[in-house]
């Protein structure tokens, strides 16, 4: 489904108003907190899925969502993500067709209004605007502390749980939901995690570096074309903090790797990004970080899902029962001349270290 089909002129107007109203949304969020303070459940044991894109983050999100034990942002929360309870009371009255359709990535994954999606970054952008430079994102460091953000985000997680609980609950005996997010940019915060991230478990999937790099370049080219054809697509992706591809591309500048980076149209750019990212990940993993091998997840679904359930303290059957949904990703044809052998060896060495330390 194209953006033209999904977002008419009235939708676009509403979204643009919301995208420019961060301060107003924050004020509404404070009102929302006062109104619903006594109804907000705790946000215990949250799970944060984060990695470079095209590594399996979306399938992990869908697998966990399907267990019925997690609460996450969905398309229904757009565009007033900072105040989901108030927006839900208003928007559900005119909810339209919820038919699942292929998402903009053109990768076969189906989404609908009730599908979980990665909108959490809008909260981070509101509180940390200085990290989003013109052509890059600056990783969080030890002196990046913001108690106001910590309090806001903790309450925000509880609001998301409340929205999903009210929508899905079928009785008082339902188990409490856990907050779940997919946010690729949380890897930029591994070295100095704000308090909410320190309270949860981070799932970090990884994939064969050359194949993941090829997949990222393909998406970059696809979204560059989409952005050229429709500026609303670019504005939408930038507003929700999706700076992975296209004209809104802002890579995370891990250890200043961008200083000598090639053009993003070259495969070497994405492979160097992969190396810089996962080296950073290896430097900052701890007991709350779970490395997930996408190869094992798709080659050995039952056993991999059982291990994943174990590390997340879930009953093993709630994930293992979904094993048939997992399949190896498509293989991208890569010209060997595009990847210098030294760069390939460097990436393979990082991949081997990840694989040795993987929990799943």
Report the location of each language-model feature:
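Short catalytic-loop micro-motif centered on adjacent basic/acidic residues
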Residues: 178-182, 291-293
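ATP-binding Walker
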Residues: 54-55
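PAPS-dependent sulfation machinery
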Residues: 76-180
């Amino acid at each position: 489904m194209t953006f033209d089909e999904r977002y008419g002129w009235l939708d676009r107007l509403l979204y643009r108003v919301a995208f420019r109203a961060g301060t107003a949304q924050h004020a509404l969020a404070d009102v929302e907190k006062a109104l619903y303070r006594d109804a907000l459940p705790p946000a215990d044991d949250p799970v944060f899925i984060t990695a470079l894109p095209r590594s399996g983050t979306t399938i992990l999100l869908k697998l966990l969502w399907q267990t019925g034990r997690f609460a996450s942002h969905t398309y229904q929360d757009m565009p007033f993500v900072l105040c989901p309870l108030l927006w839900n009371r208003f928007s559900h009255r005119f909810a339209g067709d919820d038919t699942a359709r292929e998402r903009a990535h053109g990768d076969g994954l189906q989404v609908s209004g009730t599908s979980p999606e990665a909108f959490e970054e809008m909260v981070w952008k509101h509180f940390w605007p200085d990290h989003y430079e013109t052509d890059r994102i600056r990783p969080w460091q030890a002196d990046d502390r913001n108690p106001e953000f910590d309090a806001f985000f903790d309450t925000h997680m509880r609001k998301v749980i409340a929205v999903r609980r009210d929508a899905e609950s079928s009785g008082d005996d339902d188990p409490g939901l856990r907050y779940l997010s997919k946010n690729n940019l949380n890897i930029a915060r591994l070295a100095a995690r704000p308090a909410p991230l320190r309270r949860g478990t981070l799932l970090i999937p990884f994939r064969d570096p050359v194949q993941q790099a090829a997949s990222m370049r393909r998406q970059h080219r696809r979204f560059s074309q989409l952005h050229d054809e429709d500026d609303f697509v670019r504005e939408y992706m930038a507003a929700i903090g999706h700076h992975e591809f296209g004209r809104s591309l802002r890579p995370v500048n891990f250890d200043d790797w961008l200083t000598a980076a090639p053009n993003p149209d070259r495969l070497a750019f994405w492979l160097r990004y992969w190396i810089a990212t996962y080296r950073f990940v290896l430097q900052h993993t701890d007991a709350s970080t779970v490395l997930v091998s996408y190869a094992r997840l798709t080659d050995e679904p039952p056993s991999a899902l059982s291990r994943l359930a174990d590390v997340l303290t879930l009953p093993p059957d709630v994930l293992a029962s979904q094993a048939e949904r997992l399949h190896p990703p498509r293989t991208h044809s890569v010209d060997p001349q595009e990847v210098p052998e030294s760069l390939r060896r460097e990436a393979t060495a990082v991949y081997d270290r990840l694989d040795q330390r993987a929990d799943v």
